[in-house]
Amino acid sequence: MELLHKNITASILQSFFNVAKVLPFGLDKSFYINALANDIRQADFSVQTNKLVDIFYNDNVIGQLNFDIIVNDAIIIKVDTSFDFINNERQEKSKIYLKLSHYEVLLLLNFGQEADYKRLFLSNDYKQLQQSRGSGSNGLLP
């Protein structure tokens, strides 16, 4: 099975490691977001920062989620700067972001003492299948 958005993801990860080599640990998250966004743009991708995405319930907008970076309107990037980066709470929250949005791929990027990342995916086909079965369906998908 081919990875979703494999080439874009590979380029984003290259940018991530480029930024992580240059910027030291301990800066405010916004520095990493801005540097990463600039690096990804230089690779000729469309980048949106601090993107608000509508969340729906029964065809009504009930709120918005704020994503650090969206690349090519296809991939969510969440930036972190913590010591305990890959913990279950962050992963579960990220899965919810994928479930509630039309995006299928999310990269958790940690600019901690050691650069680390996690790639999560949830296909829209799977989301639709779950909705049609009524399994966990809560009407939150647009």
Question: Where are the language model's segments positioned?
Answer:
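Extreme N-terminal tail/first-helix region
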Residues: 1-9, 130-142
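Interdomain/boundary linker segments immediately adjacent to catalytic/signaling cores
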Residues: 1-23
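Active-site metal-binding core of divalent-cation-utilizing nuclease and nuclease-like domains
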Residues: 25-76, 114-125, 133-140
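Nucleic-acid nuclease catalytic cores
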Residues: 80-131
